[in-house]
Regions:
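Hydrophobic structural segments
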Residues: 1-186
Length: 186
């Protein structure tokens, strides 16, 4: 049995599930590693709606699949500050708005003592319940009928049908999800 008490413990456990290439984006994105776990929420993306719902529900640790701060590296690297563009021009209004939104989100997270853990690479590669399998199940594909595969994707055999019928079926199967329904609470 795992003794997971802090955000750091949880992050370590998540990263032990499947070996991924380094460097990885799977890490604590925001908040203190020593934060004791009260309640855990999971989501596809930590939007402000999801964060507000988490605070309302008493969640203090959020595991998200996609970036919290809108760039793949989540507050790391040249893309955040647009340093590549600063060589030729000043910040645009769009860039300034983007940076303001990031600061507002960080203030909300800090004010509410939230910890954000990104679990992207592990979940993309986890073979028994990772993103590929979870999406296939939600789309009602036969997860035992894989015709091609690697560690990032699977190709499933399906019955021949028109593109419109397949699209309608997939849309119906995905319709139940919204930012409110995609949160799982412990």
């Amino acid at each position: 049995m795992h003794h997971i008490k802090t955000a750091a413990d949880l992050n370590c456990f998540l990263n032990s599930m499947v070996a991924v290439s380094q460097p990885t984006v799977d890490k604590i994105i925001f908040g203190a590693e020593a934060t004791l776990i009260n309640k855990i929420g999971t989501c596809w993306i930590a939007s402000m709606d999801v964060l507000r719902k988490a605070v309302f529900e008493g969640v203090n640790i959020i595991i998200t699949h996609e970036p919290t701060f809108y760039s793949y590296a989540d507050l790391e690297g040249d893309d955040l500050e647009f340093s590549w563009a600063r060589k030729i021009m000043d910040y645009t209004r769009g860039e300034l708005s983007y940076l303001k939104i990031i600061e507002q989100k960080k203030e909300f997270l800090h004010k509410n003592n939230l910890v954000i853990i990104r679990c992207h690479d592990v979940m993309d590669r986890e073979p028994t319940f990772g993103m590929s399998k979870a999406l296939a199940q939600q789309l009602e594909l036969d997860v035992t009928n894989i015709v091609a595969s690697d560690d990032m994707y699977h190709v499933y055999a399906i019955e021949p049908d028109s593109a419109i019928n397949i699209t309608k079926r997939f849309a119906k199967n995905l319709k139940i999800y919204s930012s409110w329904h995609s949160i799982l609470w412990r």
